[in-house]
Curated annotation (Swiss-Prot):
It is an enzyme of class 5 (isomerase). PPIases accelerate the folding of proteins. It catalyzes the cis-trans isomerization of proline imidic peptide bonds in oligopeptides. Acts as a regulatory subunit for PP2A-like phosphatases modulating their activity or substrate specificity, probably by inducing a conformational change in the catalytic subunit, a direct target of the PPIase. Can reactivate inactive phosphatase PP2A-phosphatase methylesterase complexes (PP2Ai) in presence of ATP and Mg(2+) by dissociating the inactive form from the complex. It catalyses: [protein]-peptidylproline (omega=180) = [protein]-peptidylproline (omega=0). Its main location: cytoplasm. Keywords: Cytoplasm, Isomerase, Rotamase. Belongs to the PTPA-type PPIase family. This is Serine/threonine-protein phosphatase 2A activator 2. GO terms for molecular function: peptidyl-prolyl cis-trans isomerase activity; protein tyrosine phosphatase activator activity.
Amino acid sequence: MSDGAELKMAAQKRLLTGSDLDKWKASKTFEELLRFVSSLAQSVRGRENSEHAEPVSPAIEALEALLEEMQGIAAHHPVLQDAATSRFGKVEFRDFHKEVQARAEALVLQVDPSLTDEQAQELAVYLGNAWGDCKRIDYGSGHELNFVCFLYGLWKYGVLSEHDFTNAVLRVFVKYMDVMRVLETKYWLEPAGSHGVWGLDDYHFLPFLFGAFQLATHKHLKPKSIHNPEVVELFENRYLYFGCIAFINRVKTTASLRWHSPMLDDISGVRSWTKVSEGMVKMYKAEVLGKLPIMQHFFFSRFLPVPDGVSPPRTSEEELADCSEHAHSTWGDCCGIPIPSAVAASEATRKHSKPLPFD
């Protein structure tokens, strides 16, 4: 793929209005994408991160190698230590993002060289946009969704099978999370929205959803266990949910979970992980797939067909227009006021020995 123009030919953004969103939510594409996410979640029910499915397919191994390469690309673009101090995103992220975009199609073909050029171009759109926004230096659930759509496309094109679903979460998505934690902490990626649209975490939703399914059959761990630091430390590498709590605790040190993550605190009062897992799917449907500030940036393609009757694609000039054309549910949701990352605030606190607010 030679440039961004080819990316736009392979996939298009089409959800621009509330009417478009209603058509999307009633569409077969919406239903099938949500079913895919639910199937991934069900495939890890009762499994720890290390409980992979055997045998491991060549496609899963190729995806793991791709993610290793992503870490290598990040290593090639270090943050300049003498750069001006800022609590906002590091500009070196743009160099990382530019290289990923330039190599996206080739990286897709490394996963399966038998993909057609058209298929590789489509998949490269989702892979290239799964790491954050290079202009705003931010990351949120829409970028996370792009990675899931990349996996969905590989499944629709026969590269992945349903047998791979467990490992797609426990080997591939877990490794994707590892890469994202590197990018979030290295480049101080800003959260795409003031508190995240859903209020769980500044960046992610799906590790909470998958993690709740992992814990659904656990006899001893309860949702309220997230308030016990020793339990969190013991299980952070075994379950995605506890891994997210551990990350939050490390970067948001100036107050309790109850203060900076009130929705997680509320969820901890639910009686069982089964109820949490059921609620997470409903929440993802409503607060991610059903919210225009996120879905107006969603790409449609041959394997994610556009619903009938939605708006035509915008021109390049319209894409670059003022963000007042976008829908926002809170200030800073999309491409407006930048929000400093909690990682940046935590680092500033460590260096200056006095607390700085992160929101």
